[in-house]
């Protein structure tokens, strides 16, 4: 595998601060179009793209994404994000994130604590955290202030098929995050698409994470362009 690219920590933090549109996608094994898809989404204005294969169609058809296959997919992400000056994130797996030279490691509430993950990944790697209630948001803000995480996500805003068993706290949690976090880096997530985006922005979010709004689009680039246009008009 090629030596992973490394970005200076200050560069990563600056790019995170400017990021508005964050895409989560699986490895698209059942389609075989990962490189084409990721490049199209990034060309449309996606700022951060994350590999998250858990619960995907590919996992149902072929089984869990093995470490070697995950690293092969990461090479595609690394190449595409380098070409488009975007950030590459890995979900959950600190070992994969480090081996792949990812820019970002994203953690759920049940994953490694951020302080432990920080001991595994390189010092300049950004770390994000999912939050699902007001208490978790407040804890994430404190962790951000302490330098344990670099951003957090809030949601889901609406129920999603990627996490069918998780209740959706809705836009009330987005409003709480806007109150608690202010202009710190945080993203609303969960069921957001072009039609729902104005409601999310009205609730106080300025950054979003999407999945199906782009992964299920007939034209991923156009879908990303539509979302980023609305986001930048509000910023």
From Swiss-Prot:
It is an enzyme of class 2 (transferase). CDD domains: TMP_TenI (cd00564). GO terms for molecular function: magnesium ion binding; thiamine-phosphate diphosphorylase activity. Disulfide bonds: none annotated. Its cofactor is Mg(2+). Binds 1 Mg(2+) ion per subunit. This is Thiamine-phosphate synthase. It comes from Mycobacterium leprae (strain TN).
């Amino acid at each position: 595998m090629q030596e992973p690219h490394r970005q200076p920590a200050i560069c990563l933090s600056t790019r995170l601060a400017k990021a508005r549109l964050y895409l989560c996608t699986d490895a698209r094994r059942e389609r075989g179009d990962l490189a084409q898809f990721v490049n199209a989404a990034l060309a449309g204005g996606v700022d951060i793209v994350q590999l998250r294969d858990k619960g995907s169609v590919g996992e149902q058809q072929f089984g869990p994404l093995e470490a070697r296959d995950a690293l092969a997919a990461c090479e595609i992400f690394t190449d595409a994000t380098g070409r488009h000056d975007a950030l590459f994130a890995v979900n959950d797996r600190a070992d994969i994130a480090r081996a792949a030279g990812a820019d970002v490691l994203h953690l759920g509430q049940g994953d490694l604590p951020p302080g432990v993950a920080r001991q595994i990944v390189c010092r300049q790697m950004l770390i994000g955290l999912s939050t699902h209630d007001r208490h978790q948001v407040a804890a994430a803000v404190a962790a951000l202030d302490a330098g344990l995480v670099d951003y957090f996500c809030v949601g889901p805003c609406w129920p999603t098929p990627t996490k069918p068993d998780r209740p959706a706290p809705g836009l009330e949690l987005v409003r709480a995050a806007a109150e608690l976090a202010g202009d710190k880096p945080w993203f609303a997530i969960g069921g957001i698409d072009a039609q729902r985006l104005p409601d999310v922005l009205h609730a106080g979010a300025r950054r979003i994470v999407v999945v199906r709004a782009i992964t299920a689009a007939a034209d991923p680039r156009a879908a990303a362009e539509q979302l980023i246009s609305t986001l930048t008009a509000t910023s």
